[in-house]
A protein has these predicted regions:
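Non-heme di-metal
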Residues: 1-224
Length: 224
């Protein structure tokens, strides 16, 4: 079995728990409130703004034996640079206060997720950062592919309010193809273990973030 497939199998339970959260089920059906979508974008901003700094830190800490992976990190940084501004633009386009979000604080789960990743790079195995990529890009593909259009229609919002989510559908599908190839090149058991561990932690904390988002009152009533 390839390592990419091993990773998916090892994190199957965590992924199942995330995608079966009530608010994720709501999102995949397009049944989310404007408050829910704005809250999601705010938390997205609080982790997306760290993507490039985290990748830079990871690239700097990779050993020479993983020079091929450092090259991939550089390419990933180029693709991801500036995406936090897309999120702020979307917040403004759906009537939110992007200045308040930019100057605000993340939820505890996002604070812990970002802190865990910086600490993993600094004190542990920097390859583990690719566990984050597994979770966030896999989730964004599902939301962009199956939820963005129906949420936009349900909330009657312009396409300019979905630049982050919609663009990450096609972009992250391409990224995940590259990601699969990169993960299948990882041979060291310690590197593989670090990716699996980080993926499990990020799934847990990312799910906690979604649990903290406000739900659509109609969806809650229907589920009751």
């Amino acid at each position: 079995m390839s390592f990419f497939d091993t990773l998916q199998e090892a994190t199957q339970r965590e992924r199942h728990e995330l995608f079966n959260l009530p608010i994720i089920v709501d999102a995949l059906q397009g049944k989310v409130s404007l408050d829910s979508y704005r809250a999601f974008l705010a938390q997205a901003y609080y982790h997306v703004r760290h993507t490039v700094p985290l990748m830079m830190a990871c690239g700097a800490r990779l050993p020479t034996r993983l020079e091929w992976l450092r090259k991939a990190v550089c390419e990933y940084i180029e693709d991801e640079y500036g995406h936090e501004q897309w999120v702020l633009n979307d917040i403004a386009a759906c009537g939110g206060d992007h200045d308040a979000v930019r100057d605000g604080q993340p939820s505890l789960s996002i604070e812990l997720m970002v802190s865990f990743l910086y600490d993993l790079i600094a004190r542990g195995n920097p390859v583990g950062l690719f566990g984050m990529v597994n979770v966030l890009e896999g989730t964004s593909i599902a939301l962009a592919t199956h939820a963005a259009g129906s949420i936009r229609d349900h909330l009657a919002l312009p396409e300019t309010a979905f630049s982050y989510l919609s663009s990450h559908g096609s972009l992250d599908i391409e990224h995940m193809q590259t990601y699969r190839r990169l993960m299948n090149q990882l041979q060291d058991p310690d590197d593989q273990a670090a990716v699996i561990h980080a993926s499990k932690v990020v799934y847990r904390l990312y799910a906690d973030m979604f649990r903290g988002l406000p739900r659509n009152a109609e969806a809650q009533h229907a589920a009751a």
